[in-house]
Design a protein with these regions (language model features):
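Glycine-biased, small-residue-rich flexible motifs in mid-sequence functional cores and linkers
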Residues: 2-30, 93, 101, 108-327
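Short, small/acidic-rich helices and loops at N termini and domain boundaries
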Residues: 2-109
């Protein structure tokens, strides 16, 4: 069943409810009720599925007393959920405004949602993401090229990134970055110059990012997609970057970390096996903790090395697919 917004925007009831419950409608989170976290949403989703409503969309027409009686929520929880579910007018206008800048929202109830996020993160996958660009790129094999802003990229690092970008284009891998100044912006420029596809996953500033020259060009050419879990006008923060990197590591076959401040979730990705092939560049001393915890060292990549590495990734992906077939 579809629910039509006041401006003619169509969403399934489940998708609509997921956005109402979890989406911040202002960048500074000034809301009548605080949107649900992913963990909170999963709990409400499970309760709805176990109830006579059958799914999350069935809650759209339930009053506060119904939420208390049939889901077993407290009065405070029920009021919060009810308030969030009745932001439909504000949500419709907010989505229409975003669409004017080429931004839409996709939920786990939509076919366009990246399947790898659900497969890898499972219950921790975000209920929705903001998206712009060519969504078909999200299903391509991909590598991440990562670094933090404020660290100078020397000629040797640039040459290594060139080899990765060239190899990715040659073998049909998208290149994923975090969109920050430094390694990410250099990588995006090389993709634009040398060929291939780019996926930027942001920790803030989505609307402004889409207007940068390189990204605007790649979007116009159908060679880029941009994702974010944050309001398009939200500022970049370290906490947003940590949440962003969970998506990065879940979406890629391999990640190449050129530099880090140690606060971007790389160690968690290693510990949780979110990304089985995480490489750390030996040319940056700050990568030592990653190397000590099991990241694979790399330095001095040569033309052709990418082809050998991706054979290992392909075998890992095939093994994972076989496991999913058995579930």
């Amino acid at each position: 069943m579809e629910k039509r917004g006041g401006l003619g925007l169509d969403h399934t009831e489940n998708a609509y409810a997921a956005m109402l419950l979890t989406m911040a409608l202002s960048p500074n989170r000034e809301e009548y009720a605080r949107p649900l976290s992913t963990q909170e949403f999963r709990r409400i989703e499970a309760l709805a599925r176990a109830s006579r409503y059958g799914d999350i969309g069935g809650l759209l027409n339930v009053d506060i007393s119904g939420l208390v009686m049939l889901l077993g929520l407290s009065e405070a929880e029920s009021y919060r959920v009810y308030t969030l579910l009745h932001r439909d007018v504000q949500l419709t206008y907010t989505l229409a405004e975003f669409m004017g800048d080429g931004i839409d929202a996709i939920t786990q109830y939509d076919a366009e949602y990246p399947q790898r996020l659900t497969e890898t993160l499972k219950e921790a996958a975000p209920p929705f993401v903001y998206r712009s660009g060519a969504d078909e790129l999200l299903n391509e094999p991909a590598i991440a090229v990562l670094g933090v802003s404020g660290v100078k990229t020397d000629p040797e690092a640039r040459r290594q990134i060139e080899i990765l970008v060239d190899g990715a284009a040659r073998r049909g891998y998208a290149v994923v970055t975090g969109g920050e100044l430094g390694v990410a912006r250099l990588t995006a420029g090389l993709v634009a110059e040398r060929g291939g596809h780019l996926i930027d996953i942001l920790g803030g500033g989505l609307r402004d990012h889409l207007k940068t020259d390189v990204i605007a060009r790649l979007l116009a050419e159908g060679r880029a997609a941009v994702l974010s879990t944050e309001h398009p006008d939200a500022l970049f923060t370290v906490s947003h970057a940590i949440a962003r990197n969970k998506l990065v590591f879940a979406l890629v076959d391999a990640a190449f970390v050129f530099n880090t401040d140690g606060r971007r979730g790389e160690l968690d990705a290693l510990a949780n096996h979110t990304c089985e092939w995480l490489y750390a560049w030996q040319g940056f001393s700050g990568n030592s903790p990653l190397l000590n915890r099991g990241a694979k060292p790399f330095q001095g990549l040569r033309d052709g090395d990418f082809d050998e590495m991706c054979r290992h990734w392909n075998r890992s992906r095939a093994k994972q697919m076989n496991i999913f077939d058995l579930l």
